[in-house]
Amino acid sequence: MLAVSLHFSPTFMKNKPTLELADLKAVAAAAEAEALKNKWAVTIAIVDDGGHLLWLQRLDGAPPISAHIAPAKANTAAVGRRESRVYEEIINGGRFSFLSAPDLKGLLEGGVPILKDGQCLGAVGVSGVKSNEDAQVARAGIAALGL
């Protein structure tokens, strides 16, 4: 009989920063303020690092479809660890086969990852106005975290 004893030390476990509810509220409030300042009716989505929806806020007048597009942009930015704009540029550059990438649906500008010390905590996706304006709102929200 062979007996094996495994001991796991806490030093093997890594801690990673995560988004707390207070972070979500701060990001959403700052993003909303940016949108309202510019009179933009948008939907704001915040996801965790795995692309799972944590927050969805549709401002008055935002198009119904924006409630589908914003989370998709956020998901793409989180799981891809880069702005969704990068994927739009890849496709616009002629790499149409990238459209077959699994689980990437928000391939338009407006999804921005939330990065801290090189780690992705999640992402913000915004939809409802021009894509560069969506990204502006997302970045304004993330700036509230002071990362």
Which residues fall in each region the model found?
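Short, Lys/Arg-enriched N-terminal segments with co-localized hydrophobic residues
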Residues: 3-12
